[in-house]
Design a protein with these regions (language model features):
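N-terminal glycine-rich anion-binding loops that anchor highly charged ligand groups
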Residues: 1-4, 12-58, 66-74, 296
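N-terminal small/glycine-rich loop or linker at the start of catalytic domains
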Residues: 2-13, 79-84, 111
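Short acidic/histidine-centered micro-motifs embedded in hydrophobic/aromatic stretches
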Residues: 26, 46, 60-63, 320, ...
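Short beta-strand segments at enzyme active-site cores
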Residues: 39-40, 111-113, 221
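Short amphipathic alpha-helical face segments that pack within enzyme cores
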Residues: 42, 98-102, 296, 300-303
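A glycine-rich phosphate/pyrophosphate-binding beta-strand-loop-alpha-helix module
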Residues: 44, 93-149
């Protein structure tokens, strides 16, 4: 029953890449529950030690997507996901999650795909749940939210039920694996534009090409050279930019965006509760215009606005992001999403009362 995964583990240990076809078959064994937890853990570890190829990643992503509950929001224009692989070296607040609401407030439809933390302190699901979001939305409810609110949140376990077979092994081995990469590549709403933060610069170009093969129209795959899986305002950022069927690579520094160099401690967030409060303060206008946390969100939101087709460059993208926050639209998107999820608005009301 599990001949392929056994053979694949041996090949990987020997340092041999799996073919596209072998990768498809072994992922089918994982997603169907045929592989044991020990076999899955061995496979993930061996893949990580060898280094995943683009072919392996694409094949795994295709099977994972086939096994998911997919939705097809009816929207005009592009549908964007802002997400990261997690596993970065700096424990920041939830930058890409905060940026998603700024992008939505700028008129770009967002299908945010996320999960609880696996290797970091606060996943997107953790922080949004703290703010009152009901994670148990049906696929139909999420589709309606994207169409009517302009943003929806897809809780990975609800949309990827077959992933239950890998949850235990992932948590038990406690290392970054191919699944950190697969989540962002398998958006159940088939988002056709993306800002994808990665924990390793070496992943940027391969994942940009993987997104192209998987049907993405425009994407920025980004890695802060200081260890961030975001566009960094602390130091340099490597960007692999997919547009018009071509992938180009570049490096940026904070001054390219017109923002000051931040210090790492200025963008950290320790707990889901702390990250939730930071997200609230940024969206509700309780951070100064030059607050490093607001600035890094604006830079990353600008990337989402660009791939979403609303801006040609970071300067205009950031201008639209500022308008999204200053007008209150970004915060309204957060409240509307929580309402659409049949969630609890009491946490937001508590924060509104606290900050006046």
């Amino acid at each position: 029953m599990t001949k392929m995964i056994r053979e694949s583990i041996q090949k990987l240990i020997d340092g041999t890449n799996l073919t596209y076809e072998e990768s498809l078959e072994v992922m089918k064994e994982v997603m169907s529950g045929q592989a044991t937890s020990a076999q899955i853990a061995a496979l993930l570890t061996a893949l990580r030690m060898k280094g995943e190829t683009v072919e392996e990643i694409i094949a795994f992503a295709e099977i994972m997507k086939e096994c998911s509950h997919q939705i097809r929001p009816r929207i005009k224009g592009r549908l964007v996901d802002t997400c990261g692989t997690g596993g970065d070296k700096i424990k920041t607040f939830n930058i890409s999650t905060t940026a998603a609401f700024v992008v939505a407030g700028a008129g770009v439809a967002i299908a945010k795909h996320g999960n609880r933390s696996v290797t970091s302190q606060s996943g997107s699901a953790d922080v949004l749940e703290r703010l009152g979001l009901n994670l148990d939305m049906t696929p139909e409810a999420v589709q309606n939210s994207v169409e009517q609110v302009g943003i929806g949140f897809m809780f990975a376990p609800a949309f990827h039920p077959a992933m239950k077979y890998a949850i235990g092994p992932r948590r038990e081995i406690g290392i970054r694996t191919i699944f950190n990469v697969l989540g962002p590549l398998t958006n159940p709403a088939c988002a056709n534009a993306q800002v994808l933060g990665v924990y390793d610069r070496k992943l940027a170009d391969p994942l940009a090409h993987a997104l192209k093969s998987l049907g993405c129209e425009e994407a920025m795959v980004v890695h802060g050279l200081d260890g961030l899986d975001e566009i960094s305002t602390v130091g340099k950022t490597a960007i692999a930019w997919l547009r018009e069927d071509e992938v180009t690579t570049t490096e940026t520094v904070p001054k390219d965006f017109g923002v000051k160099h931040a210090r790492i401690e200025e963008i950290k967030g320790t707990t889901p509760d702390e990250s939730a409060e930071i997200l609230f303060k940024i969206l509700n206008g309780h951070c100064a215009a030059d607050d490093p946390r607001r600035e890094i969100v604006l830079v990353n939101a600008a990337a989402g606005i660009i791939v979403g087709g609303k801006a040609e460059d970071f300067s205009y993208g950031m201008e639209l992001g500022r308008k999204s926050i200053n007008s209150g639209t970004a915060y309204k998107k957060l409240k509307a999403l929580i309402k659409a999820s049949a969630g609890n608005l009491s946490k937001l009301e508590e924060l509104e009362s606290k900050y006046g």
